[in-house]
């Protein structure tokens, strides 16, 4: 597993995400409804739904709102046929970018995604152009803990890898289907999970300087502002020194 901190990338974007929480909630609800519609409302038997619930909780969505979304999905939703679509491309500095969308209209979605790449000096690629650089994983963050005890609990629960970061936080990687099981396994013995999500982990990283980093962040902002875009993944790495200049 690459030795970078995925959570560092999440943290430096959190303020911007908080500013558009309403749009984030809309996207989370769309995923909850779709996951329940496709796989049923039992989180124990539906890994996609469990991952959606964990992500919603990490974003402070109430249980009541989550349950209503699941009930909508089990009841068939609103009749629209939402499909997951993955677009791949290259961003500033030669970064690899994957865009996960949930949409009922492919033409509308591509008309949102393609201009974002073009305006930021990137280009949309073909299927498979950068996907091979990423692995779908579950990622759990524990801010600080007894490293040995947490490692033992995580391995016992089925974790694939554990990484301790410089700030003392611990990142736990799992098979994406096992995210909920591992999260439960470490919480039941007393560890507090700060964040749990299914994500795409890059196998190699591209270091970004103070000139290129803002361009990539602008691309991510533009993509995340598209209604059909659920998640944006990339392999750009922004050091603490560069982040301090942004």
From Swiss-Prot:
Keyword Transcription: yes
Main location: cytoplasm
GO CC term, one of those recorded: cytosol
Disulfide bonds: none
GO process terms (BP): regulation of DNA-templated transcription
Keywords, in A-Z order: Cytoplasm, DNA-binding, Transcription, Transcription regulation
UniProt cross-references to Pfam families, sorted A to Z: TACO1_YebC_N (PF20772), Transcrip_reg (PF01709)
GO molecular function, one term: DNA binding
Highest taxon listed in the record's lineage: Bacteria
Protein's UniProt name: Probable transcriptional regulatory protein HS_0508
